[in-house]
Amino acid sequence: MSRVSQARNLGKYFLLIDNMLVVLGFFVVFPLISIRFVDQMGWAAVMVGIALGLRQFIQQGLGIFGGAIADRFGAKPMIVTGMLMRAAGFATMGIAHEPWLLWFSCLLSGLGGTLFDPPRSALVVKLIRPQQRGRFFSLLMMQDSAGAVIGALLGSWLLQYDFRLVCATGAVLFVLCAAFNAWLLPAWKLSTVRTPVREGMTRVMRDKRFVTYVLTLAGYYMLAVQVMLPIMVNDVAGAPSAVKWMYAIEACLSLTLLYPIARWSEKHFRLEHRLMAGLLIMSLSMMPVGMVSGLQQLFTLICLFYIGSIIAEPARETLSASLADARARGSYMGFSRLGLAIGGAIGYIGGGWLFDLGKSAHQPELPWMMLGIIGIFTFLALGWQFSQKRAARRLLERDA
């Protein structure tokens, strides 16, 4: 086995272990934030939505800067620094008794993610061969789902005693992850050339097709990030312990269906068709959520939503990676998170505001119908973009 093949092989295992630690650290804390501050402390959902939206927007919106810096200086220092910063954010969250302190803790957490997330994504693109990326992204998603359930179960158990224990556990896991990267991650370059920060960012911004695709995905992420789902499950069930079953459903579906669906669909369908089909299922499953009154009906709709996500997400990741320029991988993968920044922030803040508005106006279906409509519009916009791309390709072939 050549040294390059050996590095790729070892790199896969490193990425999987690193991802599990990150997912556990995140899901121990974040699924319980809305329950802690909305249900236990009585804050308005919009206050928590602002905090979560701020974290999302900072982490993903500034990702192009984190990616461009990593293109210049390498992945390792950015990843280690970012993980320690997130640990500090979680520690601060444990003592948050005022909205401004929760917002500050989410700001720290988001800045940490800005530093470590783009280089980690770029490492996947660097180490995994193009023909294997779809399946590897599926494995990462399966791991995400299993880690989400384990983290949520652990966090729910710790929440019975003290929310500070929840945050301390998340912080310790990110410190361990930082140590793991500092000890074992080689000083790999992310791009084929050591690209200056400004040049990497400029290269992305001039790629109009990539920029349009990323910005359109904001509508997809408005659906994907919904903080209201745990609150809805809690309201219908009447107990916060029911939230863990929502994550258990996601894990079971992901572990049993994600990899087989990815393997089968990559042989029969284009990436863009898989992304659009998943998005359509997600959109249609959101619309009736506010109209259900039983937990069984709600979990059925959540199952449909997760199946849509299982179809769409590996295709989205693979499509984003395939569009990235190898000369500025960090910058491209950082910018690819901008749709998540915009959609996540609007989804969190707007979703929380609509949820409060729907409750006060006795129209609980309002936020869910709006999300479904946004998903349909995003579906149509992506369809138009992909049809334009195919038309341009046919024109070039005809001219040739």
UniProtKB/Swiss-Prot annotation:
The cross-references to Pfam families, in alphabetical order and at most eight, read:
MFS_1 (PF07690)
Question: What UniProt keywords are attached to this protein's entry?
Answer: Cell inner membrane, Cell membrane, Membrane, Transmembrane, Transmembrane helix, Transport
The answer to whether keyword rRNA-binding applies is no
Annotated coiled-coil segments of the chain: none
Q: Does the keyword Oxidoreductase apply?
A: no
Primary place of residence?
membrane
Alphabetically, the GO molecular function entries are: transmembrane transporter activity
Query: Entry's InterPro entries?
Result: MFS, MFS_dom, MFS_trans_sf, MFS_Transporters, Multidrug-R_MdtH
Q: Where in the cell is the protein located?
A: Cell inner membrane
GO CC terms of this entry: plasma membrane
User: Which stretches are Periplasmic in the membrane topology?
Assistant: 34-98, 160-164, 233-241, 296-297, 359-365
Q: Which domain of life is it from?
A: Bacteria
Q: How does it sit in the membrane?
A: Multi-pass membrane protein
Annotated TM spans: 13-33, 99-116, 139-159, 165-185, 214-232, 242-262, 275-295, 298-318, 338-358, 366-386
- What CDD domains has UniProt attached to this entry? MFS_MdtH_MDR_like (cd17329)
Record topology, Cytoplasmic segments = 1-12, 117-138, 186-213, 263-274, 319-337, 387-400
Regarding protein family, the annotation reads: Belongs to the major facilitator superfamily. DHA1 family. MdtH (TC 2.A.1.2.21) subfamily.
Q: What is this protein called?
A: Multidrug resistance protein MdtH
Instruction: Tell me what organism the protein belongs to.
Output: Shigella boydii serotype 4 (strain Sb227)
